From Swiss-Prot:
CDD domains: ABC_MutS2, ATP-synt_Fo_b. The gene is mutS2. This is Endonuclease MutS2. ATP binds at residues 335-342. Pfam families: MSSS (PF20297), MutS_V (PF00488), Smr (PF01713). One of its GO terms (biological process) is rescue of stalled ribosome. It comes from Bacillus thuringiensis subsp. konkukian (strain 97-27).
Length: 786
């Protein structure tokens, strides 16, 4: 990506915000080196990885990345034989613990059923070095000191040191407390100079204690003397301290060598936790800006739903739907300055850069974005003063560079294209520049305030006009993007609300051509139609969501009903079996008594009569089958099934009608208001509804056959619309019409594309085209019939 593009789209500001969510310098280095990728597979994997980290945050709130530091230089020094300090070794131990803890954290979530395949692969690379970690922490305390327990020898040496220090202090304190010494000492304290214990003696008594003078006060009146009686003890103390230092160095060298042996593993672990820190920083940032994972496609179109700029407060900014690349490859946003056009432009650019960097973007779920090899942006004139160039010249230098490099894999963003020069020439240049980049197949978003470009949006198939809505009542932009509606200046309305007289405004209107007035009125009507369509869509969307909610609730109730029914049936069966078993036992007892009576000759009963009696008892008991859930046949119904057949769905015990076969073993079935997939093994054939006999219909050719010259499909569902188009074209041919119009509206373009795809295949169609400005523009297709 060009450095200028990253700068004008404020990519580095996004990275600055991302830095705030890293846990270590390792993660910060990753963020600082972050640049957008152009590799499709890599971008998809990065998005999936960020999504997994976001799932962890949703479930756990955080990730255990504390205590991790950049130990790479220390490990490399250990590898070449340098001795590491206690704090450096402690950092290594803490980082090894942090990596081990992170590995355990992710693996525990996976063991509990959370699907994290990518993060699981990452932590699988972490090798536990628990033994080395414990060796270091057993030798070095939290404060970075080598502890007594590091070795038996060190413990013994430090015992000697403490004993020597105690004896020295005892002798010196006795001296300072002596009444004879009070007049000779400047102060009754024991202090240290040059790592040896001394007492402060007045200058005139320097010869009383003998020993060694180590220091004197600033005035020279006090000498810090090591008395002769403790010189040997101080010497012994110093020798012990030397031994302590040697033992500490031996321990540190031993630990350093242990680190050197595992250096490659330690460095590998560090790289993994650096990546994990970076990954979770992206996930935390996504949570901060309320971003979601986009669907990444490789088909050069984007569909950003409720897109917001990440650097603007989400509570303040107005989200917009932005589509580019399917029905049109270029959006020309027209309208007055300070209307929010540039924010929309930057939103598109920064969302693409973020997505290609593996960052989630501030849009609604199911938004799609594509991968661009190059992103070019001509926004602002921040360099014009430095380069002593005019606004127009600075823009043109950049545009020339863009035209040299832009191709079908490029996204091009123009802000106020053609500005800074004569309006007529600027508009002409803008049109030529747009034609050039459009012809190369690039995806383009351009802003302009030139009215000439409004007509440009109507005259090019792959270009669509757009504007940012302006509220005349509040005299301020709403920042809502209106796709398909060109912008207008609103100068007359604003002037009127600000108090300008109607007479002056009417005179001003007379200075504008009739065509211009017609265009402005047409734009105003388009704006109103757009608002109405959007309102209708919102109402339909609300009804759809309500319907889906009711559908889910009904399905839930059906499942609960079946579960409760099965549970009650199972309970009843169990109770019945218990009663039958009790009856059998009672019968066995009776038979046994009869046998005993016969043996005692108290009854004359034959064996076959006993067996027959028991058989009658068992036959009287109903055969019960334990049932935990509804059993269905494993074989398909014997009757060959066809669409339209009535069947019984065994799971629900309900009748339904077959709609279509969706696989070798499954059908789509309509059960009341529900439509669901059902396996053939779970249904029972009932009957095939009788077909009503189709009667021949006489047709009349000519003007007496009443067929409208227009077919209005607005508001129709796609399947119904296609069926109406087929019938309408047949009727129009029967009526011998040479030309008809199909009104499909602009909308998302799906219906328009479906109509035109059908027309291409229809044998009765000679040619077709979009409507002219007076015929409905892109919202109408005019069809010439053979």
């Amino acid at each position: 990506m060009l450095e200028r593009t990253l700068r004008v789209l404020e990519y580095n500001k996004v990275k600055e915000q991302l830095l705030e969510h890293t846990a270590s310098s390792l993660g910060r280095d990753k963020v600082k080196n972050l640049v957008p990728s152009t590799d499709f597979e890599e971008i998809v994997e990065m998005q999936d990885t960020t999504d997994e980290a976001a799932k962890v945050i949703r479930l756990k709130g955080s990730a255990p990345l504390g205590g991790i530091t950049d130990i790479r230089s220390n490990v490399k020094r250990a590898k070449i034989g340098s001795m590491l300090s206690p704090n450096e070794l402690l950092d290594i131990a803490n980082t090894m613990y942090g990596s081990r803890n992170m590995k355990r954290f992710i693996e525990d979530m996976v063991d509990n059923g959370v699907e994290l395949p990518i993060l699981e692969t990452h932590v699988a690379q972490i090798v536990s070095l628990y033994d080395l970690e414990k060796k270091i922490t057993n030798c070095i305390g939290d404060g970075g000191e080598v502890v007594d327990s590091a070795s038996d020898k060190l413990r013994g040496i430090r015992t000697q040191i403490r004993t020597a220090e105690s004896r020295i202090r005892e002798k010196l304190e006795n001296m300072t407390r002596s009444s004879n010494s009070q007049k000779m000492l400047s102060d009754s304290i024991v202090t240290i100079r040059n790592e040896r214990y001394v007492i402060p003696v007045k200058q005139e008594y320097r010869g009383v204690y003998g020993g060694i003078v180590h220091d004197q006060s600033a005035s020279g009146q006090t000498l810090f003397i090591e008395p002769q009686v403790i010189v040997e003890l101080n010497n012994a103390l110093q020798e012990a301290r030397v031994k302590e230092k040697q033992e500490i160095e031996r321990i540190l060298l031993m630990l350093t060598e242990e680190v050197a042996v595992e250096a490659d593993i330690v460095l590998s672990n560090v790289e993994v936790v650096a990546n994990l820190d970076f990954i979770f920083a992206k996930a935390f940032y996504a949570k901060r800006i309320k971003a979601t994972k986009p669907i990444v496609n490789n088909e050069r179109y984007m569909d950003l739903r409720q897109a917001r700029h990440p650097l603007i407060d989400p509570e303040v900014i107005v989200p917009n739907n932005i589509m580019l690349g399917k029905d049109f490859t270029t959006i020309v946003i027209t309208g007055p300055n300070t209307g929010g056009k540039t924010v929309t432009l930057k939103t598109v650019g920064i969302c693409v850069l973020m997505a290609q960097s593996g960052l989630h973007i501030p849009v609604m779920d199911e938004s799609e974005i594509c991968v661009f090899k190059n992103i070019f942006a001509d926004i602002g004139d921040e360099q014009s003063i430095e380069q002593s160039l005019s606004t127009f010249s600075s823009h043109m230098v950049n545009i020339v560079d863009i035209l040299e490099k832009a191709d079908f894999e490029s996204l091009v963003l123009f802000d106020e294209l053609g500005a800074g020069t004569d309006p007529q020439e600027g508009a002409a240049l803008a049109i030529s520049i747009l034609d050039e980049v459009c012809n190369r197949g690039a995806r383009v978003v351009a802003t302009t305030h030139y009215p000439e470009l409004k007509a440009y949006g109507y005259n090019r198939e792959q270009v669509i006009n757009a504007s940012v809505e302006f509220d005349v009542n509040t005299l301020s932009p709403t920042y809502k993007l209106l796709i398909g509606v060109p912008g207008r200046s609103n100068a007359f309305e604003i002037s009127k609300r600000l108090g300008l007289s109607d007479r002056v405004i009417d005179q001003a209107r007379n200075h504008i051509s009739t065509d211009t007035n017609k265009i402005e009125n047409m734009i105003a009507k388009l704006e109103e139609s757009q608002k109405n369509a959007e309102r209708d869509w919102n109402e339909a969307e609300a009804l759809r969501k309500q319907s889906e909610k009711l559908h889910r609730e009904l399905q839930r109730q059906i499942i609960e009903f079946n579960e409760e029914r099965d549970e009650r049936l199972l309970k009843a069966q169990k109770e019945g079996e218990e009663k039958v078993e009790a009856a059998k036992k009672e019968a066995e007892g009776i038979i046994q008594e009869l046998r005993q009576l016969r043996k005692a000759q108290l009854a004359n009963v034959k064996d076959h009569e006993l067996i027959e009696a028991k058989s009658r008892l068992e036959g009287a008991a109903p055969e019960l089958v334990k049932k935990q859930k509804v059993n269905v046949k494993n074989t398909a119904p014997k009757q060959q099934l066809r669409a339209g057949d009535e069947v019984k769905v065994l799971t629900f015990g309900q009748k339904g009608q077959l709609l279509e076969k969706v696989s070798d073993t499954e059908w789509s079935v309509q059960i009341g208001i529900l439509k669901m997939k059902v396996k053939e093994s779970n249904m029972e054939y009932i009957n095939t509804p009788k077909q009503t006999e189709k009667k021949a219909v006489a047709t009349v050719k000519g003007r007496d056959y009443h067929v409208s010259l227009e077919l209005d499909l607005r508001g129709e569902r796609f399947e119904n619309a296609m069926a109406r188009v087929e019938k309408y074209l047949d009727d129009a041919q029967l009526a011998s019409y040479p030309r008809v119009s199909i009104i499909h509206g602009k909308g998302t373009g799906a219906l328009r594309q479906g109509v035109q795809d059908y027309l291409k295949k229809h044998r009765g169609v000679k040619t077709f085209r979009y409507g002219d400005m007076g015929e409905g523009g892109l919202g109408v297709t005019v069809v010439e019939l053979k």
